[in-house]
């Protein structure tokens, strides 16, 4: 982490900066760093607080029940969900789980850091069209993107080892892979026995000191938690310190953006937001970069509709918010006679990517990877909220005994798969539900 002095300016909201960046996560943090270090004036608008390493604790109840690092849909930030457009969306947990703090979800995610393969960029050309989908090639190739993958690897800090199915890379990982933990050993043994090729998982967690940050202390509180020693390579501890030290970047926290305004010729002029006390501010900017994740970005574009842009900004195609794609997820949990203690250390240390591209003769599309981990992210509270052993007791001493067994003797094997782009899977504005600021709630149809 850059330990330079925070030399950030304070820009008047009524004077246009070169760039207003909405969001400080994986995209926003990098964008702010690149722009500010190139000499541009930048204001970052972040909806959450600026938490430091000392703020990150092992409080399982706060994290897993109260969603301390996320927007809690139960407390002023509702989301609605429906499976088809013929249904009425209902308020609930829609699976849009993202952090609200400086660094965004790069602060609380598991650290898995897989590269796409060459085929992923040209798959439509190779496989042909898929009826009923908007399946197309990327406008760039893996070869064009590879230098930037490597730049990210080294600047934020990754640990790993080139695997047998990995695409070409111009430089090795900056840090060696994490030591293998018990779920990784189980996956490795089973995969090799079946003829597959497991290898060390690439993770955005430091196995050794890098760029002034320490290596992992293997506390086990990664998935859903911020890192108490800054070994997890979030943009909050990698990119943003450099941006703020440039003298060209101002970070404003707890700013809830409501809309993006344009002038008579359709050019963006300002971002309107509320401060924590409800004061409305309009920050003028020559350009606006939306880095508010795959849900909040379309929400802001749709909320910025005007007479000139009746369907929202940048939506002449009608595609804003459509073709929503999730990480397909299948989990098998094994309960072992002997203790596994899978909750220790980082979530994942071994992966199997033999199934990244499947045999088309199987009759369906897509592939993915497999990893092994603790089924409840190493959190006893999460295991308890999950009900303990399947079909087992749910109260009393027998329940506590079964919960201890589940927590210490279980291991999950998790499949991460592709999903197809369908216009019917989308993020739109709910016409009937609003958040605490009066903004239309995010409505997920999937």
Protein language model regions, located:
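Extreme N-terminal leader/targeting segments of oxidoreductases
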Residues: 1-19, 37-38, 62-64
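N-terminal Rossmann-like FAD-binding beta1-loop-alpha1 element of flavoenzymes
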Residues: 19-44
């Amino acid at each position: 982490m850059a330990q330079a002095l925070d030399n950030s300016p304070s820009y008047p909201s009524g004077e246009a900066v070169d760039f207003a960046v909405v969001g400080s996560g994986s995209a926003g943090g990098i964008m702010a760093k690149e722009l500010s270090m190139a000499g541009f004036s930048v204001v970052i608008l972040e909806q959450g607080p600026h938490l430091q390493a000392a703020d990150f604790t092992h409080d399982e109840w706060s994290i897993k029940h109260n969603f301390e690092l996320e927007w809690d849909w139960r407390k002023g930030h509702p989301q609605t969900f429906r499976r088809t457009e013929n249904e009425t969306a209902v308020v609930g947990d829609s699976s849009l789980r993202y952090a609200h703090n400086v660094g965004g979800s790069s602060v609380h995610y598991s650290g898995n850091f897989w590269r796409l393969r060459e085929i992923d960029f040209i798959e439509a050309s190779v496989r042909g069209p898929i009826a009923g989908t908007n399946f197309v090639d990327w406008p760039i190739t893996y070869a064009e993107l590879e230098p930037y993958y490597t730049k990210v690897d080294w600047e934020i800090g990754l640990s790993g080892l080139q695997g047998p199915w990995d695409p070409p890379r111009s430089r090795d990982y900056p840090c060696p892979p994490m030591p293998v933990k018990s779920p990784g050993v189980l996956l490795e043994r089973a995969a090799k026995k079946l003829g597959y090729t497991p290898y060390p998982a690439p993770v955005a967690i430091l196995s050794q000191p890098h760029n002034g940050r320490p290596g992992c202390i293997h506390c086990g509180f990664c998935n859903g938690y911020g890192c108490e020693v800054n070994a997890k390579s979030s943009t909050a501890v990698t990119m943003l310190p450099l941006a703020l030290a440039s003298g060209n970047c101002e970070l404003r926290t707890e700013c809830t953006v409501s809309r993006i305004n344009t002038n008579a010729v359709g050019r963006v002029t300002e971002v309107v937001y509320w401060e924590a006390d409800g004061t409305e501010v309009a920050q003028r900017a020559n350009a606006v970069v939306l880095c508010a994740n795959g849900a909040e970005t379309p929400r802001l574009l749709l909320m910025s509709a005007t007479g000139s842009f009746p369907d929202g900004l940048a939506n002449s195609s009608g595609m804003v918010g459509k073709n929503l794609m999730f990480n397909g997820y299948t989990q098998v949990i094994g309960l072992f006679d002997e203790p596994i203690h899978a909750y220790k250390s980082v979530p994942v240390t071994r992966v199997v990517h033999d199934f990244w591209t499947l045999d088309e003769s199987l009759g369906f599309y897509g592939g993915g990877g497999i990893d092994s981990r603790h089924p409840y992210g190493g959190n006893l509270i999460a295991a308890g909220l999950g009900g303990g052993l399947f079909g087992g007791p749910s109260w009393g001493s027998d329940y506590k005994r079964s919960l201890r067994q589940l927590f210490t003797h279980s291991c999950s094997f998790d499949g991460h798969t592709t999903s197809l782009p369908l216009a019917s899977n989308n993020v739109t504005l709910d016409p009937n539900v609003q958040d605490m600021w009066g903004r239309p709630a995010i409505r997920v149809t999937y």
